[in-house]
Amino acid sequence: MNCKIKTVSPLTTYAVRHPVLRQGKPIASCAFPGDEDPTSLHLAAVFNEDVIGVVSVFTNATGVFSDLKQMQLRGMAVLPEAQGSGIGKMLVHAAEIYAKERGTTLLWFNARINAVHFYERLGYQIMGEAFEIEGIGTH
């Protein structure tokens, strides 16, 4: 699929966050702490002017590896009809470049259990035990 990755506003991410990550919940549930922080980045995969995938990067530390400069990948989502086409990989790669350009040595995220294999294929490793986010699912 031939699409462009571009920087967008937090509000633009809701077009994918809502149906993929917050389905059946109020649209306000798509707002994440840090969305409006000037150091946060929101990326969208755009195909024929439609947003089909999104990811956000936040300056946030895990509390583990405190000696490393950390950023958090969050809100990674691709519309079902575009999944499996390489869009997610493109978004993660663009987020990695952004983090690296800012001297980040650890890019981390809380992956949903059904997305773990996707991240492992990109070279990421599981750290820690699975946990439940109420109303969202197992991570």
List each model region and its residues.
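Active-site rim helix/loop that mediates acceptor-substrate recognition in acyltransferases
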Residues: 17-48, 62
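Conserved beta-strand in the GNAT
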Residues: 44, 50-61, 72-77
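A conserved beta-turn-beta hairpin within the catalytic core of GNAT-like acetyltransferases
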Residues: 60-73, 83, 135-138
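Conserved acetyl-CoA-binding loop-helix of GNAT-fold acetyltransferases
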Residues: 78, 84-97
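Conserved GNAT acetyl-CoA-binding A-motif
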Residues: 92, 99-112
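A short beta-loop-alpha structural element at the N-terminal edge
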Residues: 2-14
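Conserved active-site tyrosine of GNAT-family acetyltransferases
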Residues: 17, 119, 124
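Conserved catalytic-core motifs of GNAT/GCN5-like acyltransferases
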Residues: 108-110, 125-139
